[in-house]
Amino acid sequence: MQFSLIPFISSFALTVIFLPLFIGFMRMKHEGQVIRDEGPKWHEKKSGTPTMGGVVFMLASVISTLWVLIWQKNLNKTTWILIIAFLGYGIIGFLDDGIKLYFKRNLGLKAWQKLLGQIIIAALIIALAFSDHFAFELYIPFAGMVRNSFLFSLFVLFWLVGFSNAVNLSDGLDGLATGLSIIAYATYAWIAYQEKNWVIVAFTLSVIGGLVGFFIFNHKPAKIFMGDAGSLALGGGLATVSIFLHRPWSLLLIGIVFVLETLSVILQVISFQTTGKRIFKMTPIHHHFEMLGWSEWKVDIVFWIVGLIGSIIYLIIWG
């Protein structure tokens, strides 16, 4: 099978065609983002900006992946696992966004409801992988390759839930999570291409195409936000791709900004609960730099560069 940019082009085209219509629909319905009180005060001017844009690039990515792989006669169980992970986490985010919009508040699903949904999707992925005779083995530093279905399943559960939330935490500035996700998915597209894993190539290129189309409307000043529907889907998709390329640990470098954003929140909570003091002015850490006086564009560019450096380092050493 030959490499093709058709998945990228298809997803990009679908997104740039339908996203303006979606933005117009949301504005007509007066449905927009409710900005949380705990965030930077200058973010309040973003209140009312249409959200849930992730639904558009998510569907564009799924449609493009499916029709291209059907056309190439390469549809297999891995395809469906990727789609289920991407759509499954996206649906959880969609429900979360929908509740926020319906009740005009910044809180959607309760934490336990969202976590339960994420665990169910992860469990489904594990079950499908098991039925597909996927190699349940995990490399553990200093211990080597460990073949243990239970340990591997726990890891997959943690990885999917953890990174879906990590991307979600990073979606706090115009274009930030979109740019970081483009870099991460492009890195995995290259790895999959090198390994001739055409299913993952098609999926990652479709997601990249959707994200590039979405970025046109999401960069500062954003005309639309991706919402939890987009960020949870992107995180779940990244985690699943890393696992099915048998390179799960790669996400620690390729998704280094997502990791740092999450660590900043964890450290802040631990510090405040144990000492009563905060390490950062505000978390996730992109808000800390805003509080230091950095513009959104400066934070975006610096964080994108860090993400790009992480990906390049991984490719140089292990690619």
Curated annotation (Swiss-Prot):
The UniProt record lists the keyword Iron: no
Localization, UniProt: Cell membrane
GO CC annotations, alphabetized: plasma membrane
EC class name: transferase
EC identifiers of the protein: 2.7.8.13
Reactions the enzyme catalyzes: UDP-N-acetyl-alpha-D-muramoyl-L-alanyl-gamma-D-glutamyl-L-lysyl-D-alanyl-D-alanine + di-trans,octa-cis-undecaprenyl phosphate = Mur2Ac(oyl-L-Ala-gamma-D-Glu-L-Lys-D-Ala-D-Ala)-di-trans,octa-cis-undecaprenyl diphosphate + UMP
A Pfam family recorded for this sequence: Glycos_transf_4
UniProt-listed InterPro entries: Glycosyl_transferase_4, PNAcMuramoyl-5peptid_Trfase, PNAcMuramoyl-5peptid_Trfase_CS
Keyword Metal-binding tagged: yes
Pathway where it operates: Cell wall biogenesis; peptidoglycan biosynthesis
Transmembrane residue ranges: 5-25, 51-71, 79-99, 116-136, 149-169, 172-192, 197-217, 224-244, 252-272, 299-319
PROSITE patterns: MRAY_1, MRAY_2
Membrane topology: Multi-pass membrane protein
GO biological process: cell division; cell wall organization; peptidoglycan biosynthetic process; regulation of cell shape
Keywords assigned: Cell cycle, Cell division, Cell membrane, Cell shape, Cell wall biogenesis/degradation, Magnesium, Membrane, Metal-binding, Peptidoglycan synthesis, Transferase, Transmembrane, Transmembrane helix
GO terms assigned for molecular function: metal ion binding; phospho-N-acetylmuramoyl-pentapeptide-transferase activity
Cofactor section: Mg(2+)
NCBIfam families according to UniProt: mraY
PANTHER family: PHOSPHO-N-ACETYLMURAMOYL-PENTAPEPTIDE-TRANSFERASE, PHOSPHO-N-ACETYLMURAMOYL-PENTAPEPTIDE-TRANSFERASE HOMOLOG
Family: Belongs to the glycosyltransferase 4 family. MraY subfamily.
Function: Catalyzes the initial step of the lipid cycle reactions in the biosynthesis of the cell wall peptidoglycan: transfers peptidoglycan precursor phospho-MurNAc-pentapeptide from UDP-MurNAc-pentapeptide onto the lipid carrier undecaprenyl phosphate, yielding undecaprenyl-pyrophosphoryl-MurNAc-pentapeptide, known as lipid I.
HAMAP family, per the entry: MraY
The protein, known as: Phospho-N-acetylmuramoyl-pentapeptide-transferase
Lineage, broadest ranks: Bacteria, Bacillati, Bacillota, Bacilli, Lactobacillales
Name of encoding gene: mraY
